[in-house]
Amino acid sequence: MAYIHRTLEQKIIDISRDYSCLLLIGPRQVGKTTMLEHLMEGSGRQKVTLDDVENRRLAQSDPALFLEMHPAPVLIDEVQYAPQLFSYIKINVDNGAAPGSYWLTGSQAFQLMELAQESLAGRTAIVHMSALSQSELYGDGTTEPLSLKLEKLNRRKEHLSSCNSMEMFERIWNGGMPGHRSGRYTDRDVFYSSYIQTYINRDVSDMIPGVDKLLFADFIRAAACRVGQMLNTHDIAQDVGVSDDTAKRWLQVLEKSEVIFYLRPYSNNLLKRTVKTPKMYFFDTGLAAYLTKYSNPEILMNGAINGAILENYTVAEIRKTWLNSAKECLLHYYRDKDTNEIDMVIEADGELHPLEIKKSTNPGTELASAFKVLDKGSVPRGAGAILCLREEISAIDRNTFILPIWMI
């Protein structure tokens, strides 16, 4: 099994020089612990996991003793199982713990962020990690957040590998989970089947004691069928046979464990006719393709959700470019009551950058016409792009590019 280097590695090293405590959060099995273990080789840092029942029991019942038995520098894995540790780590940090003393990982992002902000506010750096990016799998892993400045786009090409339409859907179908993509688990279907079972049996069961596991599995599949769509909780609830309130709670669980994420609609005081409903995406398109039972990339490319899952892949990859730089990402979509719609809007450096995503190798220039609606707002519109299956970069004008999705 080959280790796949992660873009976040240097960020982790840099942050650990400044902060005594680092909290690395992200979905289950995206490689958080593997990356940190790689970085700590030969450093003398020890690792302790709260997956171990005895370690968990001690951390919960006597957190002070636990930290004495596992002195810094230490990696504490799955820290969400012992929230009692946070206030004791705070004491150690306040007493002068050295930079890089505590590396913490966990897969329940919302709970962990809340704990860190309550107990370790200003004392810990919080970093998000997702599945492997295009840059990590098919490039050199060094790309910055997506920028639509021409010089940066030209430089970006040097770090990534181009692909045709079929190869793009192979990327989408295979997903970005390190366990599968590193070669450790070669059978994709077996890997994702095991992933879902572990996720429900451990994470979901912890968050919803007594949950009907088979029904929840059906619920995840129903959600996967709706990637790239405006969220309709009632429709998902009806498909599965649960109440709307139950569906809302279960969607919260999927979001808190980062299986799904949302794009919120962009709005400001001058754009008052915009909709309020978010769009839903899966963090990993391989998981979504598995749940929707597409047995190979070719069938997926010609299937009913081909455009939606391509959009999901594109949005998730853009999001990763920001997460992998440890920078805040202000990503939205636009839709108003006059049916004007823009698939994605990036808010960066005081400008709005509109993006349209299309399953086409030769998209029409009229697709960029909706971008002008943003001119009615108070934030200036910057460069935009049509993201598509074209293999080479092109442009409509100096402010609107036609960009291959492989360049993200």
Label each region the model flagged.
Residues 1-27, 33-46, 50, 70, ...:
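A cross-kingdom feature that marks ATP-driven nucleic-acid transaction machinery
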Residues 105-109, 115, 123, 130-132, ...:
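A short beta-strand-to-loop transition that corresponds to the Sensor-1 phosphate-sensing loop
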Residues 69-85:
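Conserved P-loop NTPase "ATPase switch" module shared by AAA+ and STAND
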Residues 135, 139-316:
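Interdomain hinge/linker elements that couple catalytic modules in large macromolecular machines
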Residues 86-104, 108-110, 117-119:
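Conserved catalytic/switch belt of AAA+ P-loop NTPases
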Residues 45-73:
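Short glycine-rich substrate-engagement loop in P-loop NTPases that contacts/grips substrate
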Residues 110-126, 138-143:
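Short regulatory helix/loop adjacent to the ATP-binding pocket of P-loop NTPases
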Residues 54-56, 81-83, 111-112:
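Catalytic P-loop NTPase motifs of RecA-like helicase/translocase cores
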